[in-house]
Amino acid sequence: MSQEEIKDLTLLGNQKTNYNFDYDLNILEAFDNRHQDNDYFIKFNCPEFTSLCPITGQPDFATIYLSYIPDKKCVESKSLKLYLFSYRNHGDFHENCINTIGKDLVDLLQPRYLEVWGKFTPRGGISIDPYYNYGRPNTKYEEMAAYRLMNHDLYPETIDNR
């Protein structure tokens, strides 16, 4: 990559990283996708996601799976890590966390397709696994999003692996 392509990336390689413990959308950064002529998935797995229950203040733990088909922009991975870390002291329901993450990334990237799946560890004997997806309107990706939403969990895993 040229210096011009990475001039707006402020976090990658920064030795004085500031870890924000409160939700902060402005942490996210993107760079140009040099393969816009290809449809391809980029997938991130975050096995150490934490947030707080908005009622009890107790920590919630999850693995977050994020997959997307980029268009013009790709998310910079260190900024994504710090953005997800910023949920550490953020009090919100699991469903809201996953939907907010998805919408923030759609706003930043304008991807062709994006999905976020949160697999939260059980609390009180029940686990919650919210799923968000987006397909660009009036394209095949909108149809893909509808199909994947309807079929995303046909064969649910057992939860004894968490």
Curated annotation (Swiss-Prot):
Record key words, sorted: Cytoplasm, NADP, Oxidoreductase, Queuosine biosynthesis
Catalysed transformations (reactions): 7-aminomethyl-7-carbaguanine + 2 NADP(+) = 7-cyano-7-deazaguanine + 2 NADPH + 3 H(+)
Signal sequence segment: none
Catalytic-site annotation from UniProt: 53 (thioimide intermediate), 60 (proton donor)
Enzyme Commission identifier(s): 1.7.1.13
Family that this chain belongs to: Belongs to the GTP cyclohydrolase I family. QueF type 1 subfamily.
Protein name from the UniProt record: NADPH-dependent 7-cyano-7-deazaguanine reductase
Organism lineage: Bacteria, Bacillati, Bacillota, Bacilli, Lactobacillales
